Design a protein with these regions (language model features):
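Short, Lys/Arg-rich, polar N-terminal cytosolic tail immediately upstream
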Residues: 1-3
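N-terminal active-site segment of His-dependent metallophosphoesterases
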Residues: 6-48, 77-78, 90-185, 283
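Cytosolic-side transmembrane helix boundary signature
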Residues: 48-84
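Extended active-site neighborhood of metal-dependent phosphoesterases/phosphodiesterases
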Residues: 98-129, 183-272, 286-314, 320-370, ...
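Hydrophobic beta-strand anchors of alpha/beta hydrolase catalytic cores
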Residues: 135, 172, 239, 272-273
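Active-site glycine-centered loops adjacent to acidic/histidine catalytic or metal-binding residues
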Residues: 140, 176-177, 209-210, 277, ...
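Short, solvent-exposed loop/turn elements at domain surfaces
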Residues: 143-150, 248-249, 283, 342-345, ...
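Acidic, His/Gly-rich catalytic cores of divalent-metal-dependent hydrolytic chemistry
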Residues: 371-376, 380-393
Length: 393
């Protein structure tokens, strides 16, 4: 292969490599992409990476082989140019598809009655004159997925709105995976329209889930719900929301320091409720597709749980599609991924920390400040009690 042709093939391959590298670097900077890769869903990413590297490998091989067998080197050089063209087309097409969806026209729909975390919630006065607060939490409705149960999620929201109108419910917290694919405006539009229809006046707050973040979905989440990491005070009850999508991939030293400072600032005789999408303790199963265990999250338990144990009274998460109550290290841990997303299979692993679990049912967790303490009640989507625990100081 002639030196000039080798240089041209190598330059073309380097351009293809640079284009694909830029796309992949952007993708991995986005929230949730590293978690998606670590949890075994990185096949498309690996395919794009291979397509970016292969032309350069072939071009370098062409230069090496060309000294001994010019004809083979020439064929390899031509192959490198063809592969480079395919790689650049793939990078361009993927970029156009992702960016046009993630940063395209906004999802035009009325937003729910969003709570301003900085203003918090004002507790009501109970019959005995003491402060009372009652909120509902659920997670993983997955708008945009055919297998989701639209009737169940609507029933949960409508029940919560009716209780709010009756003066019995103060707020609703959606703990993530609101939509199936976060970068798509269509899913957000339908979700926001449905939430606004079913809960027109109910104060609402949302966390970002791993599906909400797909890929570049953070901009659409922020437009819909605002920040997903905050502290919200409601009299003697304090809510702390953490940005934990697949796990602690994005939980750095700054996040840990912020969490430590928030926990330390709450009086010991008041209530601390921590919210996240990814679970900590949970029963679950082995994912047949990836071989990954969807139960007792080792990374979360190693890196984040020690900060919360014994300091947070209650930690509520989604991600796994169960309703479950667990107790460990002086803290109660709840999973409530039951807002209509396809139920997860019957657990093949039951966490040693599990006290109660429901599989295959949709519902919510109702947390209420009562004179005895903090009442925590799982209900099905019709409001029937399934399990209740009262936390006491």
């Amino acid at each position: 292969m002639a030196p000039a042709k080798f240089r041209a093939a190598t330059a073309t391959a380097l351009s293809a490599f640079a284009a694909m590298s830029a796309l992949l670097i952007w993708a991995f900077v986005q929230p949730g992409t590293l978690g998606m890769y670590r949890w075994g869903y990185g096949a498309p990413i690996l395919a794009l990476a291979a397509l970016g590297v292969l032309p350069l490998v072939v071009a370098l091989a062409a230069g090496s082989i060309g000294h001994k067998t010019p004809k083979v080197g020439t064929v390899a050089g031509i192959a490198s140019v063809i592969l480079s063209a395919i790689s650049m087309l793939a990078a361009g097409a993927a970029s156009a598809y992702i960016f046009s969806n993630a940063y395209g026209a906004e999802a035009t729909a009325d937003r729910p009655a969003m709570i301003d975390p900085a203003k918090g919630l004002t507790p009501r006065m109970g019959p005995d004159g003491s402060a009372t607060l009652r909120v509902a939490l659920s997670s993983d409705p997955h708008w945009g997925r055919d297998a989701s149960d639209a009737k169940a999620r609507s029933a949960i929201l409508r029940l919560s709105q009716a209780e709010h109108e009756a003066g019995r419910l103060d707020a609703f917290f959606d703990l993530g995976d609101t939509v199936e694919t976060g970068m798509m405006a269509g899913g957000w539009k339908v979700a926001l329209e449905d939430i606004h229809r079913d809960t027109p006046t109910l104060p609402f707050a949302g966390l970002m889930g791993n599906h909400d973040a797909l890929i570049g979905g953070k901009a659409r989440f922020n437009a819909a719900f605002g920040s997903s990491s905050w502290r919200m005070d409601a009299g003697p009850v304090h809510f702390i929301a953490l940005d934990l999508l697949w796990g602690p991939e994005g939980f750095g030293q700054r996040d840990r320091a912020w969490l430590e400072s928030q926990l330390s600032s709450i009086p010991a005789d008041e209530w601390t409720v921590v919210l996240s999408h990814s679970f900590f303790y949970s029963s679950g199963y082995i994912d047949e597709e990836t071989g990954k265990p969807w139960y007792d999250h080792e990374d979360m338990l190693r890196r984040v749980a020690p900060v919360l144990a014994g300091r947070a009274d209650l930690v509520v998460s989604g991600h796994n599609h169960y309703m479950e109550w667990l107790e460990a290290d002086g803290t109660a841990w709840a999973v409530v991924g039951a807002m209509g997303g396809k139920p997860d299979p019957v657990p093949s692993y039951v966490s040693p920390r599990s006290v109660w679990i429901s599989q295959g049912q949709f519902g919510r967790l109702v947390v209420e400040l009562v004179p005895e303490g903090l009442s925590c009640e799982f209900q099905d989507h019709g409001g029937t009690r399934l399990f209740q625990r009262t936390l006491r100081k």
